[in-house]
């Protein structure tokens, strides 16, 4: 759906410059967007874009974007209003704050028509109260779908648990209070799951938040101290703390393999 944008005001407020828009945009709401900059705001009418320079702050509801430079490209509609279609933020550190989460990078691009955002740069990071996600290449977010994708050496840490993979994909849903909560987490490629008790590896994994069960597939290995379980598929029930390993075509004879060393596991205190 094309988001309509109307220019409400463009004026100078020393020592900052301010511009206010009304559009469904950064946070998927109809609240107005306010852009302030320490140095200047430029309106390039021929090229059809706005540019804010130095210490830029974009605020819409509970969502805030901070950067050094921001450009907003727009198209003119038939009724002479302006539809912003692409927002680009750059700087040594670009920060997006939404509710209790913060994302960090060096460049962020938001495609308004697609409700799609991508963040790139060094030290990509997403921090929330109970977990942290890092990636080497990109952090992608689909606003309407509630999907987050971390690409390239992706790592998610929560308490004492860590999951690593080439790509991590998190899907969210709204709870009864209208707050987005985790629905599922997919790990794709070179998966390593580390807990205080064991290390699990495989080609891919899926965690279902509703059932609290994780499934690891292809070339699966569970290592606890010196003991090793190998199979084609593993299920880990985090409710009962019971893990099941299954054989398959990737295993010799389709059998599960386990190697155990007596006395290698410390007894619970």
PLM feature segments, named:
Residues 1-4:
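Positively charged n-region of N-terminal signal peptides that target proteins for export
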Residues 8-16:
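Bacterial N-terminal signal peptides
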Residues 7-8, 22:
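General helical structural elements
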Residues 20-269:
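N-terminal amphipathic/hydrophobic interface segments
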């Amino acid at each position: 759906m094309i988001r309509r944008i109307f220019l409400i005001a463009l004026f100078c407020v020393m020592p900052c410059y301010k511009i206010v828009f009304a559009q469904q945009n950064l946070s998927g709401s109809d609240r107005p967007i306010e852009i302030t900059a320490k140095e200047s705001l430029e309106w390039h009418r021929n090229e059809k874009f706005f540019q804010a320079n130095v210490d830029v702050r974009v605020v819409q509801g509970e969502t805030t974007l901070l950067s050094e430079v921001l450009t907003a490209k727009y198209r003119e509609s038939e009724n002479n209003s302006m539809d912003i279609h692409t927002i680009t933020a750059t700087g040594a550190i670009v920060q997006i704050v939404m509710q209790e989460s913060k994302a960090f990078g060096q460049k962020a691009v938001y495609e308004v028509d697609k409700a799609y955002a991508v963040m790139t740069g060094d030290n990509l990071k997403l921090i929330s109260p109970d977990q942290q996600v890092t990636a080497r290449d990109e952090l992608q977010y689909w606003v309407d779908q509630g999907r987050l994708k971390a690409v390239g050496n992706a790592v998610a840490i929560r308490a004492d648990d860590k999951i690593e993979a080439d790509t991590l994909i998190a899907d969210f849903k709204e709870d009864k209070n209208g707050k987005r909560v985790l629905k599922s987490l997919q790990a794709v490629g070179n998966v390593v799951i580390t807990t205080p008790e064991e290390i699990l590896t495989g080609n891919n994994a899926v965690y279902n938040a509703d059932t609290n069960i994780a499934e690891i597939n292809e070339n699966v290995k569970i290592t606890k101290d010196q003991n090793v379980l190998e199979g084609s598929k593993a299920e880990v029930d985090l409710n009962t703390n019971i893990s099941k390993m299954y054989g398959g075509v990737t295993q010799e004879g389709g059998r599960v393999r386990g190697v155990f060393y007596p006395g290698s596991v410390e007894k619970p205190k």
